[in-house]
Amino acid sequence: MAVFVYAENINGIYKKAAFEAVSYAKAVAGQLGETVTAISVNPTDSSDLLYKYGADKVINIKDEGLKNFSAKAYAKAVNEVADGNILVFPHTTDASSVAPMLASMKHYSLRTNVLEAPESITPFQVKRRAFSGKGFMHAKADASGVIVTVSQNAFGVKENPASGTEEVKNLTIENEDTKVLSHEQSSGKLDLKEAEVVVSAGRGMKGPENWGMIEDLAATLGAATACSKPVSDIGWRPHSEHVGQTGKAIAPNLYIAVGISG
């Protein structure tokens, strides 16, 4: 039976996290001798992007009612088409809220923040982050039904081209739990979750007027900017840049901290 993977898109566009999740699913499928089926909701990007990383089949869910994200509604939609025993999700903010709801619907085990391909399939055992990223855990699950979320920038994006096929699935999922009053889309900035280099700063900068040097350094390095919790709390920087235990969990290859204690 195919290994299923949720290929998350943002406004129809696939991001690095989706390619990493497909790469991971391909590794799992390789251990099982199975194929990979990717699922996406209302994508506009070509399925060729997913074939490149190993998807043998792509199921595109089309549903006008799912234009606005709702974890519960998206979980219902994925549940309609995913009939495999192993499902892979990226560990993004949205996808990691869909995964537990889907696990509850299917009565599957859930293993989050996974770092590497399974150490074994029977039993299903993976290495995952624990204790706010300060340690690791080797967690087992029943391979007859398990969902994993793949920690970003951990497994990596690996090309493994497949001659894929595409299927369009038209659904009508009730999405009455969510009412969007407004939507603000940031533009022109790197996604902190996907950035390989991050420059972060704290109260040691003395004030928001001194942030120009941080932004200049980030621009020079091709990095994303981040900040500490106190800085976002007092309004020097937007809350979307807050990283750490109480903010966004990130995993860049290079992290530069300026004026941050601890």
Residue ranges and their predicted role:
Residues 1-262:
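N-terminal glycine-rich FAD/FM-binding segment characteristic of electron-transfer flavoproteins
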